[in-house]
């Protein structure tokens, strides 16, 4: 397919292209790569996450510590699925190896299967693209990267009509893109770890346009503000109805360091970028 009469239509190779990117030069004419720079700075562990999640805990010490304690070379955070039919891949063991099984690959019967001991879903570990790696493992990816399979994504691809030369913006999928996924490396790990976290504290994806009703800018904003309200209330404060307070992670990363709010009642909305600014919202 042609993007213009003189240009072939191309597309990114998916978030699985991350691994090859770590071996690419940091800038034109330079030999340094992400991996060589990490080695130069003696970095042993890396946290990677999907950028569309406003509740992500960057370099979460709990996740990093858990993964290191487990001596994992790769690890993933997961959240419990909300329902059997939720459109999310699950971390599972397939062929004696850890992998992410896409929701489209699971039958209705498998999706609804219950754990005989807990009564919960058997396949409940929803993948949220939140991963831990050792730099040793990242360096090893190149040795098996050619074995990773491409995934087919059917997309609406703008193109040029070869007969008229006019640009066409299709209303339905008209082509296939070949993509790699960041979790495709899971089956190649020697020690894999999984940490289940609370969805309302660590996962609010932004995937849809404004006004969609779920996983959109409004739901991301709602979930972030609700979390920060919980931070204040757990610390002993009261927050009046309809008051919206956003707390910079420079003030509190996960609700810690807010002892000064105990007993206070917040009546004004605002963005808090320094602890002393909280007093102005009482």
Question: What would you call each of these model-derived segments?
Answer:
Residues 1-183, 281:
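Domain-scale recognition of functional cores that engage charged ligands
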Residues 110-121, 125-282:
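Terminal amphipathic alpha-helical/low-complexity segments used for targeting or macromolecular assembly
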């Amino acid at each position: 397919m042609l993007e213009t009469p003189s240009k072939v239509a191309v597309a990114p190779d998916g978030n699985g292209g991350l691994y090859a990117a770590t071996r690419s030069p940091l800038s034109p004419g330079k030999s340094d790569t992400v991996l060589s720079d990490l080695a130069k700075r003696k970095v042993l562990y890396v946290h990677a996450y999907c950028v569309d999640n406003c509740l992500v805990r960057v370099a979460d010490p709990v996740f990093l510590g858990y993964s290191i304690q487990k001596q994992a070379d790769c690890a993933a955070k997961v959240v419990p699925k909300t329902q059997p039919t939720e459109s999310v891949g699950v971390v599972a063991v397939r062929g004696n190896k850890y992998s992410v099984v896409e929701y489209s690959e699971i039958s209705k019967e498998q999706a609804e299967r219950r754990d005989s001991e807990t009564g919960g879903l058997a396949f409940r570990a929803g993948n949220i693209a939140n991963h831990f790696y050792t730099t040793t493992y990242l360096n090893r990816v190149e040795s098996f990267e050619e074995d990773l399979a491409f995934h087919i994504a059917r997309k609406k691809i703008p193109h040029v009509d070869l007969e008229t030369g006019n640009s066409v913006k299709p209303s339905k999928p008209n082509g296939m893109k070949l993509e790699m996924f960041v979790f495709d490396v899971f089956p190649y790990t020697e020690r894999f770890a999984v940490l289940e976290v609370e969805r309302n504290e660590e996962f609010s994806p932004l995937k849809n346009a404004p006004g969609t009703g779920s996983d959109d800018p409004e739901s991301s904003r709602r979930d972030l503000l609700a979390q920060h309200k919980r931070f204040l209330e757990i610390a002993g404060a009261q927050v009046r109805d309809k008051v919206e307070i956003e707390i910079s992670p420079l003030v509190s990363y996960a609700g810690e360091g807010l002892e000064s709010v105990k007993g206070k009642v917040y009546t004004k909305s605002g963005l808090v970028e320094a602890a002393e600014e909280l007093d102005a919202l009482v």
